[in-house]
UniProtKB/Swiss-Prot annotation:
Coiled coil: none
Gene: thiG
This protein's name: Thiazole synthase
Quaternary structure annotation from Swiss-Prot or TrEMBL: Homotetramer. Forms heterodimers with either ThiH or ThiS.
GO cellular component, one term: cytoplasm
Length: 260
């Protein structure tokens, strides 16, 4: 089980709802992933109007928990306003907080992110901040009251996988009581498994599944990879070594093979 604030979930995969070839494939992919939390963009979809009604009907049919986000927001005021609208529309205090600094890299504006998180937490929100892998930023977010931190592995949609393994490991080591979710930049199931092997609590995916040749099959692949990576972490991975270490003992081997 993984805990997000005061709620527990069985799946360690959070999934996005954008970019799928069709609404039906979106639904099938989410079901196949086993995800219990689905992120939605308030800026991309509307809760009113025919198109918006159809989208929300599809989401409701899945019986999942909705995590609205502030994707596309370029400043603190914009992000805070969007978060408050999301709370009214979806009757949830959860918000995936994104404050973007640059349109080319979609890198988080970490200064604005911390400020927005402080404002929203004081207003009763439970914030899921999308941030870089910088420990100092994560510590400021924790000080602001965030109990979930969502560092990127690489820029959104880049499919590069974990580019700064040491920094992500440091976050895990220094924040043992915080729920950590790798968010953005993963492109293959092996990337997700690596994140879980580092001890991360969950992974958030969208583009890697939605843009696959077979999104439904890819959703299943990520589900299995996350389960495998978590199992490996819990089992206790052996440490890497600089030199070889024989797995077969020399006791009982023929004498002519023994080293004198």
């Amino acid at each position: 089980m993984v805990k997000f604030y005061d709620r527990e979930f069985g799946s360690r995969l959070l999934i996005g709802s954008a970019l799928y070839p069709s609404p039906a494939i979106m639904q099938d992919s989410i079901r196949e992933s086993g995800a219990e939390i689905v992120t939605v963009s308030l800026r991309r979809e509307t809760a009113g109007g025919k198109a918006g009604d159809q989208f929300w009907s599809l989401i409701r049919e899945l019986g999942v928990t909705v995590l609205p986000n502030t994707a596309g927001c370029r400043g603190v005021r914009d992000a805070v306003t969007t978060a408050k609208l999301a709370r009214e529309l979806f009757a949830t205090s959860w918000i995936k907080l994104e404050v973007i600094a640059d349109n080319d890299t979609l890198q988080p504006d970490v200064v604005g992110l911390v400020e927005a998180a402080q404002i929203l937490i004081k207003d009763g929100f439970e914030v899921f901040p999308y941030c870089t892998e910088d420990l100092s930023v994560a510590l400021r977010l924790v000080d602001a009251g965030c109990r979930v931190i969502m560092p990127w592995a690489a820029p959104i949609g880049s499919a590069r996988g974990i580019t700064n393994r040491d920094a992500l490991k440091l976050l895990r080591d220094r924040l043992p009581d915080i729920t950590l979710v790798v968010d953005a930049g993963l492109g293959a199931p092996s990337h997700a498994a690596e994140a879980m092997e580092l001890g991360y609590d969950a992974v958030l995916l969208n583009t890697a599944i939605a843009k696959a040749e077979d999104p439904v099959a890819m959703a299943r692949g990520f589900k299995l990879a996350i389960e495998a990576g978590r199992t490996g972490f819990e089992a206790g991975l052996m440490g890497a070594r600089d030199f070889a270490s024989p797995s077969t003992p020399v006791i009982g081997t023929p004498f002519w093979h023994a080293v004198s």
